[in-house]
Amino acid sequence: MKLLEDKIKSEGIVLPNNVLKVDGFLNHQVDAQLMFEIGKEFGRLFKKQNVTKILTVESSGIAPAVMTGLAMDVPVVFARKHKSLTLTDDLYTASVYSYTKQTSNQISISKRFIDEKDRVLIIDDFLANGQAVSGLLDIADAANIDVVGVGIVIEKTFQKGSQIIKDRDIQLESLARIKALTDDGQVEFE
């Protein structure tokens, strides 16, 4: 998606250890118009999958997931990273490691919001090592729901995350595919 690649080139910051900082438009401040276009594109790419729900992980996946839900006219359910008083014990859970935060989180989704009749599309901001997607796939397996696709805003193709999805023969669509983050701060796209 050229619009997204241009935004990454102009505002993304390459940090050490293959980290791409995009907090100016995706995961701190959100460019709503860009998210709207991202949602429309995911809606187009997964149109034939008869999606009934979208799953994501809080918090950076929420903006693109909501815009995709709007484009597809389906609800969005996000996995919570922290248990709150409003979350009951009737939950699907999975453990997810965050490379950028160097922590593990127990993600949870209430059993009230997903069931085995659902055809789920997973949307997330980044795909690198595949931990967040893997956690959502674990929850989908526990709920016995059909995952019909995974939509990623930014994929680091030089890391192994996509293999988890390919091994399960799930449609994967990444709007920006990065093949390298260079030492001099450049982003190289496929």
UniProtKB/Swiss-Prot annotation:
It catalyses: XMP + diphosphate = xanthine + 5-phospho-alpha-D-ribose 1-diphosphate. Belongs to the purine/pyrimidine phosphoribosyltransferase family. Xpt subfamily. InterPro entries: PRibTrfase_dom, PRTase-like, Pur/Pyrimidine_PRTase, Xanthine_PRibTrfase. GO terms for molecular function: xanthine phosphoribosyltransferase activity. Its EC number is 2.4.2.22. Converts the preformed base xanthine, a product of nucleic acid breakdown, to xanthosine 5'-monophosphate (XMP), so it can be reused for RNA or DNA synthesis. Disulfide bonds: none annotated. Xanthine binds at residues 20, 27, 156. Keywords: Cytoplasm, Glycosyltransferase, Purine salvage, Transferase. This is Xanthine phosphoribosyltransferase.
